[in-house]
Every structure is written in structure tokens, then in C-alpha cells.
Amino acid sequence: MSDTWYTPGTAALSNVLIVGDHASNHVPPGIELGIDQAVLDTHIGWDIGVAALAWALGAPAWLGHVSRLVIDLNREPGDAALVPLASDGHEIPGNAADTSDRISLYWQPYHDGLARHIALTAPAMLVSLHSFTPRLTTRPEEQRPWEVGVLYNRDERAPRLAIPRLEAAGIVTGDQQPYSGKLLNASMNRHAEAIGIPYLGLEVRQDLIDTEAGVARWAARLGPIIAEVCASIA
């Protein structure tokens, strides 16, 4: 628990558990990534706005407390990008050394703790909460018009309920955009699909939730939809 944040949430979404693998850009003492703090503060270091949005939604939340550049909690051991050597055009020189201890120090406690928490609390649905940059430095020509993306792998129960509701609310919605849950879904594969818990993978565009006002607006828009999807599945 020392490297995760847990907040119990409020009654509004008490039967949902938000999981935010990339909610922090914290680099623990003793780790030298070899990059400036200014880089860590961008989308390269974390999912901007996710922690604030999780708190604003009021659901119980399990949030990673180390930067994705220290270790990517949404990948499995053995994945070449678990400890990235580069991200969106920026080399991470400190990750060229032996980093195998980061699995036992950060990855394993995060996932073991999450598994125990799910077993103890039995949430009706998980919400995998991420955010995405409007534009990648390495692909400036790529258009990312979506306000919210919905990601999933094999279990489509929650996505099929959520997508039409998001669209009906006037939200520009990407189905498996800007990433595909068929490729990037490690935490939900492990903690939801493997044990049959419904889940909703959400990617929110970062420029919409990088201010307090933006967070409040999108919590108000997404909260009722999440609650309705969860109730419809139950």
C-alpha cells in the first residue's frame, strides 16, 4: 500500500472501483531516470488529470503511485516496454541499467494489493481510467479528435452499454481509440476478465481534465453514465 493511493469514495459510486495505473508521475528516491522534471510533468510521465478525476467521481479508487517511466503498471513482466527505454521521442537513460528489482518493489505490491482489495470488496464493476495526449510529439500529423475513448478486450458488456450513452450525451467517443484494448489491457485482463468482473476502460483527453474546472465538468458528465452502466449490468 505504500506505493498506491486508495480512497474509499462516496456513496454515489460505491459499487464501482476505479483503477488508475498511471495516475502519478512520482519517482521514488534512489531512482535516477536521467530526464528533467519538465518531461515527467508531461503525458510521458503520467496520465494527466486521472487522479483528480477519480477523486471527483467519488468512487473508490486504486491508483498507482509511481511514474509509468519507473515501471508501467499496465504491462506484464516480460513485456519489453515494462520499463521503457524511450517514450514519445524522449530517451530514458536511467532505464538502461538493471531495473529488475522494480517488479518486486512496485509492480508486484500494486497488483497483489489490488487483487486482495477486489477479493475483499467484490466491486460490481471496475473502471480502468486513463488519459491521452491530444497530440504525440513523434506523430504530429495524427488527429485525436475523441474526447473519450472506450477500450476493451474480450469482455464487451460494459463498453456496449457505455458507448451509446456517451454518444447520446454529446461526447465525441472513440471505440477502441486512441488505443486498442486488444493490445493494451494488461491490468483489466488480470483483474477483471480473468475472474469475470465487468469493466469499463476509459481514456479521457488530457486537455479536457488538466484544470479543476475541467475535472469537475467531466466528473459531472461521466459519473451518471458510469453509474447507469454499472446498474444495467447488475
Question: Positions of the model-derived regions?
Answer:
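N-terminal catalytic or cofactor-binding beta/alpha core of small enzyme domains
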Residues: M1-A234
